[in-house]
Amino acid sequence: MKDPKAPIGVFDSGVGGLTVLKALRRLLPREEFLYFGDTARVPYGGKPLAMVRRFAWEIAGFLLRQGVKAIVVACNTASSAALPDLAEDLSVPVFGVVEPAARAARGFRKVGLIGTQATVESGAYPRYVDLAWAKACPLFVPLVEEGLWDDPVALLVARHYLEDAPKDLEALILGCTHYPFLKGAIGAVLPGVALLDSAELTAQEVARALEAEGLLNPEGRGRTFHLVTGDPEAYRALAERLGERVEAVRRVSLEEL
């Protein structure tokens, strides 16, 4: 029997998953979270899917050893590479971010997708929604990880990637949890296009599932503990620039995974 007071594990290649974490905390204020950022190996998007799959299994195994009651794969690349196997084989509920974002796009006639190279090439999104256009944007994650989401260079890069988007595009799936931090630049290039991310819908799915399984924490304090594979203080500085209050962060060596 899983313990309702156990934490929820959330992981991403870096800080992108903080968008999902924030949505989870809004809906589940009593839950405790372990947020794992694989900052020593970010970005995932240019790596082979088999390698990303191995990373996802390593992190999921580590989180299980910390006693989590559920795992949220808050990374589109890792969700594309590993979610079906993780969900089938792990002993706790596992949630990804691909299907929720695809569901949000179904009300639009002409939908585009931007994501990492691995996510776009995986074919994960076309399983759930018809796409009129898709584009890999490999520089977007490094821009966010370097703290440049509101720098003029972000707008230049967005123009470079998005200039060939169809003129009649109605909605664009932000197929990477880092990309919501670039909504300003993306929206400036594609005014009038609905920008869809999976954070809120993923959080709603997690909340429904935990309630159905009797796993909601009735009396938690809503704390978040941060774990990173890279420099903890660099992570803290970047996360706090993104609005995340980091009270506790610990480095996890790759040998611990």
From Swiss-Prot:
Catalytic activity: L-glutamate = D-glutamate
Keyword tags: Cell shape, Cell wall biogenesis/degradation, Isomerase, Peptidoglycan synthesis
Enzyme Commission designation: 5.1.1.3
GO molecular function terms attached to this record: glutamate racemase activity
Keyword S-adenosyl-L-methionine: no
Active-site annotation: 75 (proton donor/acceptor), 176 (proton donor/acceptor)
Ligand binding (substrate): 12-13, 44-45, 76-77, 177-178
Keyword Cell wall biogenesis/degradation listed: yes
Pathway(s) where this gene product acts: Cell wall biogenesis; peptidoglycan biosynthesis
Example of a GO biological process term: regulation of cell shape
InterPro entries: Asp/Glu/hydantoin_racemase (IPR015942), Asp/Glu_race (IPR001920), Asp/Glu_racemase_AS_1 (IPR018187), Asp/Glu_racemase_AS_2 (IPR033134), Glu_race (IPR004391)
A UniProt-annotated Pfam family: Asp_Glu_race
PANTHER family per record: GLUTAMATE RACEMASE
NCBIfam families linked to this entry: glut_race
Biological role: Provides the (R)-glutamate required for cell wall biosynthesis.
UniProt family annotation: Belongs to the aspartate/glutamate racemases family.
Name of the molecule in the record: Glutamate racemase
Source organism (scientific name): Thermus thermophilus (strain ATCC 27634 / DSM 579 / HB8)
Source taxonomy: Bacteria, Thermotogati, Deinococcota, Deinococci, Thermales
